């Protein structure tokens, strides 16, 4: 069993801070459970372009408001508390933030915890080496 508090990862390599958002990765590929979980805060007034070409991501909005723009289908969705969106088709998208959005993000395959988006909004696919025999 793994039990962690958000403060356990704050200020560590699993706490990634950028101009538009910061993310604290609570469960990562290092935990070897097949997915990762993080809390991300998208900053008010920011516009963020993302494209998870290597991952499926589920996002659950806990607080804040904004818009999700699906670049592939030219469709805009309103975001607020209780909203979930699932990027299951590697959709290019943009999040426009009206008030700080706090969300819980789940990735498959799991992220290692240090990823940042490249110039295309993509996380690289970083994988851990397999555990030595008898270590699993």
Show which residues each predicted segment covers.
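A short, N-terminal "cap"/entry segment at the start of jelly-roll beta-barrel domains
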Residues: 1-35, 116, 120-136
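Short acidic-glycine-tyrosine-enriched beta hairpin
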Residues: 73-90
């Amino acid at each position: 069993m793994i039990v962690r508090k958000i403060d356990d990862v704050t200020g560590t390599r699993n706490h990634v801070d950028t101009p538009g958002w910061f993310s604290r990765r609570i469960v990562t590929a290092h935990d070897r459970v097949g997915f990762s979980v993080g809390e991300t805060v998208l900053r008010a007034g920011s516009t963020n372009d993302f494209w998870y070409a290597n991952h499926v991501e589920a996002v659950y909005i806990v607080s804040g408001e904004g818009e999700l723009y699906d670049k592939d289908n030219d469709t805009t969705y309103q975001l607020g508390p209780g909203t979930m969106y699932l990027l299951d088709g590697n959709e290019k998208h943009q999040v426009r933030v009206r008030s700080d959005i706090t969300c819980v993000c789940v990735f498959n395959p799991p992220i290692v915890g240090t990823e940042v988006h490249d110039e295309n909004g993509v996380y690289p696919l970083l994988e851990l080496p397999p555990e030595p025999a008898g270590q699993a």
